[in-house]
Amino acid sequence: MLELALGVPSLLSASTLSRPALASSFSNASTLLSFVFFFFFFKDSSPKASAMSSVGSFSASASAETLLDFFFFFFNPANKSSPEPFSLPFTAASKSSGITFLVFFFFFSAGSNPNSAAKSEDISCVLII
């Protein structure tokens, strides 16, 4: 029932795994979950909170491609006989979207609490990644 609500296909049957179908399903599910996540963290109606919620949900849905690349690299049987087992099939867009999500997560999670501020070591860790 939850799978139908989120648009995620059943991952138990390996015969139904196709990357384009999963990409759209994971993108829809991650967008929905990110809206729920940011709604609970930014409950006030200030313009700053609504802007952070929009940017955060966009970057979360963009990073679904990166999560999908991880899934297909580690669970795809075709990768077992690959001549280059450590060549990850990431595109430049999926790498940048994942890094964008991490940057926004660190900045906005630190900015959501008025008693805390983004620490320089947290930001430098994100920039190194």
UniProtKB/Swiss-Prot annotation:
This is Putative uncharacterized protein YPL238C. It is a multi-pass membrane protein. It is found in: Membrane. GO terms for cellular component: membrane. Signal peptide: none annotated. Keywords: Membrane, Transmembrane, Transmembrane helix. Almost completely overlaps SUI3. The keyword Transmembrane applies. It comes from the Eukaryota. The keyword Membrane applies. The chain crosses the membrane at residues 22-42, 55-75, 88-108.
